[in-house]
């Protein structure tokens, strides 16, 4: 035992056996302790060894536990348990076997053979089950191959391919992969490259979410179905998991050892295995720990060039350019296969193919119109992602939302339940009272409580029945899918009798049950549970993701849009033309008749200061989002310098602020349905207008990161004071002199705001007083302003040059200042009503 040199796993097993014996109070470490320690090891080789000789590890483990339970126990022993004679003999045999096989370390498989040798209880147990020393020796040669044990962690390289990869063809055989619809050209191209003699390594390149991984899964399904050329028939596709290969590799060289073992397994398969690496760019730099260490990319290069490793990769365009193209030697070993984004029509076909899987998973029905809506709405509104991924996600989330509603208690039941609880509490309180009125109320209350309890029971029963009907349909669909998968497997394996029994016996039987259950699930008088995903559900998910109201107009919203001018006119006085133009643009958008490739509306508001240009933008944001601050406001006076254009769209690469993004593009990217106000547009540098040309015409803008930001659901408002005070012709002449024709030509409308007259100012007085009243309401104070006082404010606050802004200052000075002094002096208290009148000399206002 002097030269005993255990591997890490062997040492861990001995330590675990010692602890188990010590905890149980056993005086000796018996072979049963060692076997149990080996069987319970994570990623241990004992269980695979037993499986290789046809023994069930769970059975051996249970019988080993029974042996441990019968071992003698010593109480009060202070010494550590020692190895028993049989355990020592097993380890000696393991040491001899390691020497015989020219291994440098005693590994766990050597110990397993040692435990099966001799006449101990464990040896009899293993031999009795067929795990004789000879059988175990033959099995571990199969498991570890021709590799010698030359490191303390050899187990990491055993069955390396099984450990660090997923067999896609096996998953396809089991029916666990989603069906792949279309993509025939791309799959054919991949097959062509794989059939080459050398450099037979296709790499699928495309945007995220276009279906690169699905193409490889489609190839796996075709291999299983036999729908491939002879060169690929009966091949196995394994998806390599580089993450698990790197995970836990603590020491230098450990990752390389694991990868080498995987590559050797692939090489030894004599071309039977096709390797797939998703996110191919991760091989560049994977496992490199510093100077002198090799990364995965460099390790696989020679095998790729010789054609010993058939590798299919998948990565995005950006990652390929950034990582693979940098290494020219690696890039030339791959053949690019470009995967483009499918059209909306192709996406609908893909969704129809996946529909059954999602229906079975969520237990709800998905209508065809929902699939069409998912493809069209995702294409129009979710611009930062790609089809078919974004459309599939919409369907998945809409079905998930509906399933959640089915599993949750309906609102009707919740409301009745809360009412019953409240009535029960009231009943308990009244039952303690003895007066006549309480007794009368108690009788009425008990009658009402009985009615509500009956109603609750009825609703609960109805809900449960509806839920059960939906569950029956879901279970039958699951059965049907499982039987169809079983039938396909039987057909592939040549078991035609079983395939015929399933296809003409059990499948029609389940289909018949399903046909009978479906009308029962649908024929419900008062439906509490919705079990069908429709276009409205898809539109709701789009709205939740983007904030864009993509759903059908509800009655209340329709009425609100039809009286939009009235709502905006309450805040913006005297600008009927501008209010109508903006309202029409919003209505066109919501009714779906506006140009889908342009912004909802693009207006330039012209006119003197203080007439309501900015106020209309605020009123519009308030109308659409119930918050006047819910708009993107860009003060163009801050963009007077040429270099400030970068602040709008983001600094170019290499400049300070590149990571921050643009103030305009980032705001719209986060909230694509919004009002964008460019205030005082004439103060901006002319180059800013050039940036806005694309926004006004195409409804999109490319930011500093190269991302396209969608402006098609925004309302763009540009305000300016150009030519204020002049006639309409003079104002338009000033606009033409300042802005380029191509800029003006892209606007929907140039609206000239009229100056305010004294009558309109009286209405603005009411608005200003209402705003002051809102602030005072927090102190429960009320203002009672007389009509003469309002006229006095309108008359004194009117200035044709400055518009309505002097009026706001006047309200603040004439009322706000006096009121503040009165509050501080204690002349006015919370809850008071303060009258406001004109002074006798008509020179000021009097409060109180």
Curated annotation (Swiss-Prot):
Segments of this protein annotated with the region NBD1: 159-341
Gene Ontology cellular-component annotations: cytoplasm; peptidoglycan-based cell wall; plasma membrane
GO molecular function, one term: ATP binding
Main location: cytoplasm
Gene Ontology BP terms: cellular response to heat; protein refolding
C-terminal: annotated span: 756-848
Annotated region described as Linker, given as residue ranges: 342-547
Amino-acid positions noted as binding ATP 1 in the UniProt annotation, renumbered to this chain: 206-213
Entry binding sites for ATP 2: 607-614
Entries under CDD domains matching the protein: AAA, RecA-like_ClpB_Hsp104-like
Location of region: NBD2: 557-755
Location of region: Repeat 1: 6-71
Domain comment, as recorded: The Clp repeat (R) domain probably functions as a substrate-discriminating domain, recruiting aggregated proteins to the ClpB hexamer and/or stabilizing bound proteins. The NBD2 domain is responsible for oligomerization, whereas the NBD1 domain stabilizes the hexamer probably in an ATP-dependent manner. The movement of the coiled-coil domain is essential for ClpB ability to rescue proteins from an aggregated state, probably by pulling apart large aggregated proteins, which are bound between the coiled-coils motifs of adjacent ClpB subunits in the functional hexamer.
PANTHER family in the cross-refs: ATP-DEPENDENT CLP PROTEASE, HEAT SHOCK PROTEIN 104
Record-given protein name: Chaperone protein ClpB
Organism (species): Mycobacterium tuberculosis (strain ATCC 25618 / H37Rv)
């Amino acid at each position: 035992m002097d030269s005993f040199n255990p591997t890490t796993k062997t040492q861990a097993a001995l330590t675990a056996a010692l602890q188990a014996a010590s905890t149980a109070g056993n005086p000796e470490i018996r072979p049963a302790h060692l076997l149990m320690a080996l069987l319970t090891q994570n990623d241990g080789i004992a269980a695979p060894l037993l499986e290789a000789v046809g023994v069930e590890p769970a059975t051996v483990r249970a019988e080993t536990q029974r042996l441990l339970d019968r071992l003698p126990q010593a109480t009060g022993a202070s010494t550590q348990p020692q190895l028993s004679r049989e355990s020592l003999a097993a380890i000696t045999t393991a040491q001899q076997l390691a020497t015989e096989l020219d291994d440098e370390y005693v590994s766990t498989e050597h110990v397993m053979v040692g435990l099966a040798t001799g006449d101990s209880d464990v040896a009899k147990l293993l031999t009795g089950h067929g795990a004789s020393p000879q059988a175990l020796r033959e099995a571990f040669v199969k498991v570890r191959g021709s590799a010698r044990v030359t490191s303390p962690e050899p187990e990491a390289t055993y069955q390396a391919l099984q450990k660090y990869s997923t067999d896609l063809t096996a998953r396809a055989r089991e029916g666990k992969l989603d069906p792949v619809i279309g993509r025939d050209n791309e799959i054919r191209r991949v097959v062509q490259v794989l059939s080459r003699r050398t450099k037979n390594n296709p790499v699928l390149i495309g945007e995220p979410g276009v279906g690169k991984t699905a193409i490889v899964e489609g190839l796996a399904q075709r291999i299983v179905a036999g729908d491939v050329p002879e060169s690929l028939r009966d091949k196995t596709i394994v998806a390599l998991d580089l993450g698990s290969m790197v995970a836990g590799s603590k020491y230098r060289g450990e990752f390389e050892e694991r990868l080498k073992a995987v590559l050797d397994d692939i090489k030894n398969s004599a071309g039977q295995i096709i390797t797939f690496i998703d996110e191919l760019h991760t091989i560049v730099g994977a496992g490199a720990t510093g100077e002198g260490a090799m990364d995965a990319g460099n390790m696989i290069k020679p095998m790729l060039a010789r054609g010993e490793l058939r590798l299919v990769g998948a990565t995005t365009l950006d990652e390929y350019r950034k990582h693979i193209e940098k290494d020219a030697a690696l890039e030339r070993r791959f053949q690019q296969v470009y995967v483009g984004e499918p059209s909306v029509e192709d996406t609908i076909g893909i969704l129809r193919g996946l529909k059954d899987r999602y229906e079975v998973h969520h237990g709800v029905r998905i209508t065809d119109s929902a699939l069409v809506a998912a493809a069209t709405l995702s294409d129009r509104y979710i611009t930062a992602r790609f089809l078919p991924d974004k459309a599939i996600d919409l369907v998945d989330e809409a079905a998930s939302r509906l399933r959640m509603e089915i599993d949750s208690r309906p609102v009707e039941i919740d409301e009745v339940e809360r009412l019953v609880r409240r009535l029960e509490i009231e009943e308990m309180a009244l039952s303690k009272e003895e007066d006549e009125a309480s007794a009368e109320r108690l009788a009425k209350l008990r009658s009402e409580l009985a009615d509500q309890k009956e109603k609750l029971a009825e609703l609960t029963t109805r809900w449960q029945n509806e839920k059960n009907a939906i569950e029956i349909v879901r279970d039958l669909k699951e059965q049907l899918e499982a039987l169809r998968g079983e039938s396909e497997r039987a057909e592939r394996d040549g078991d035609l009798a079983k395939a015929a029994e399933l296809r003409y016996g059990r499948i029609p039987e389940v289909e018949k049950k399903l046909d009978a259950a479906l009308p029962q699930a649908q024929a419900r008088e008062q439906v509490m549970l919705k079990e069908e995903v429709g276009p409205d559900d898809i539109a709701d998910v789009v709205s939740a993701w983007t904030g864009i109201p993509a759903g059908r107009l509800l009655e209340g919203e329709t009425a609100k849009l039809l009286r939009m001018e009235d709502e905006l006119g309450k805040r913006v006085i005297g600008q009927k033309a501008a209010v109508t133009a903006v309202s029409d643009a919003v209505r066109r958008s919501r009714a779906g008749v506006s140009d889908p490739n342009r912004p909802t509306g693009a207006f330039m508001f012209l006119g003197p200061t203080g007439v309501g240009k900015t106020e209309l933008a605020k009123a519009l944001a308030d109308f659409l989002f119930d918050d006047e601050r819910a708009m993107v406001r860009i003060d163009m006076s801050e963009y007077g310098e040429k270099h400030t254009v970068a602040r709008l769209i983001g600094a170019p690469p290499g400049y300070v602020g590149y990571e921050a993004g643009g103030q305009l593009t980032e705001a719209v990217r986060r909230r694509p349905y919004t009002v964008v106000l460019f205030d005082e547009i004439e103060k901006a540098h002319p180059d800013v207008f050039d940036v806005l040309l694309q926004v006004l015409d195409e409804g999109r803008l490319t930011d500093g990161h190269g991302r396209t930001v969608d402006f098609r659901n925004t309302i763009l408002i540009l305000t300016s004071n150009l030519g204020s005070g002049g006639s309409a012709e003079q104002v338009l002449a000033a606009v033409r002199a300042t802005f380029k024709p191509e800029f003006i030509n892209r606007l929907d409308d140039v609206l000239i705001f009229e100056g305010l007259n004294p009558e309109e100012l009286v209405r603005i007085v009411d608005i200003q007083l209402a705003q002051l009243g809102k602030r005072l309401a927090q102190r429960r104070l009320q203002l009672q302003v007389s009509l003469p006082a309002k006229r006095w404010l309108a008359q004194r606050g009117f200035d044709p040059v400055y518009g309505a802004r002097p009026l706001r200052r006047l309200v603040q000075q004439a009322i706000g200042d006096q009121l503040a002094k009165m509050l501080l002096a204690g002349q006015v208290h919370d809850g008071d009503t303060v009258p406001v009148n004109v002074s006798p000399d008509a020179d000021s206002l009097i409060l109180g």
